[in-house]
Design a protein with these regions (language model features):
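Active-site neighborhoods and metal-handling regions in enzymes and metal-associated proteins
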Residues: 1-334
Length: 334
């Protein structure tokens, strides 16, 4: 229990009691809940701030600082138990996606993207879990279709053979959250594998992932890491876009941020936060790839939970390196 320092009979004013205690302890810094960049560290109301200032002697007023770093370090740090649970939760997320991207759920030519979205929602409820955001399922394909399959897409886009299907999905359990984007290919009649050009495109997305996570170094800021990753990716002829964020007690948590959709040069505040051990991230990014066979660009949009600890970076429960195949025959059949 936290010991109370206020005796109402001796000092009716809480603010005076707080001020007297601060003076008696003579701290060199007085951390308060204010922050320019992190909402989680910016909860002190203006009225309370004014009352605190008015109650303190002037020399102590000058010692007031933001306690932002303390709040962010606490919220971003994962315990060993949380790391073990996180792996299990991410595994459940992968399993739901794998089942959603199968003929158990999808009948090519009949099932639409919203059908899959709501199947995912219902699956989560059956498992007594929660989602922290509404899932999305979208399609990229040959012919005239939007490069940004997730932006302005028709809600009832029927999934067809030859489609590249993408989802963005995350669940919540025991205060932790996952955030995952994966890709599937719908086999055409007679096909047993995805086209080589799509498999090569996925490899480009994986290479951008490596360019980012291979440069995770303790003490390096998100903006520094982002700059290196983009430079290395472009040197390999890739077209990257990185928007990786902290993950844990919140889906978009506080901590080191590596780019945003509209901030590929760096992010003020959270991008300047250094990388610490025992922290988790949604490794979220995409690689734009021109597909000759489709005469258009596509985006390989990927997102996987990652952990940075004393041994370096690792994926919490693996990452996608092969396309999920929708319509694949059972292995016992020839």
């Amino acid at each position: 229990n936290i010991r109370s320092i206020w005796n109402k009979e001796e000092q009716p004013s809480q603010w005076e009691a707080l001020s007297n205690y601060i003076v008696s302890q003579n701290p060199q810094k007085i951390g308060i809940n204010t922050s320019k960049y992190y909402g989680i560290a910016d909860g002190l109301a203006k009225t309370d701030y004014d009352a605190l200032i008015q109650s303190l002697p002037s020399k102590f007023q000058k010692r007031i600082v933001s306690a932002e770093t303390l709040a962010v370090r606490w919220i971003e740090t994962r315990t060993p138990l949380e790391v073990r649970l996180f792996s299990q939760l991410t595994g459940i997320t992968h399993n739901i996606i794998q089942e959603a991207f199968s003929t158990k759920v999808i009948t090519p030519g009949f099932t639409n993207t919203e059908d899959v979205v709501w199947w995912m929602r219902e699956k989560v409820l059956k498992l007594d879990l929660n989602t922290w955001f509404h899932p999305t399922v979208d399609i990229q394909r040959s012919g005239k279709s939007d490069l940004y399959g997730f932006d302005g897409k028709p809600k009832f886009d029927v999934i067809m053979p030859g489609d590249l299907v993408h989802c963005d999905f995350g669940i919540s359990y025991l205060t932790l959250n996952t955030d995952c984007q994966e890709l599937a290919y719908v086999l055409k009649p007679g096909e047993t594998d995805a086209p080589q050009f799509l498999k090569e495109a996925l490899k480009q997305g994986n290479t951008v992932q490596d360019a980012l996570t291979d440069n995770f170094i303790k003490g390096r800021t998100g903006n520094e890491t982002l700059k290196i990753a983009i430079k290395e990716s472009k040197k390999l002829g890739l077209r990257p876009q990185i928007y990786t964020h902290p993950l844990g007690l919140y889906g978009h948590s506080a901590g080191t941020t590596f780019g945003m959709w509209d901030a590929q040069q760096g992010v003020p505040g959270s991008g300047e936060h250094p990388l610490y051990e025992n922290t988790a991230y949604a490794i979220e990014l995409n690689a734009k790839v021109y597909i000759d066979q489709w005469q258009k660009d596509i985006r390989i949009m990927l997102e996987e939970a990652g952990f940075f600890g004393p041994s370096g970076f690792r994926y919490v429960n693996g990452r996608q390196t092969n396309l999920i195949l929708i319509g694949q025959k059972s292995k016992y059949l020839e």
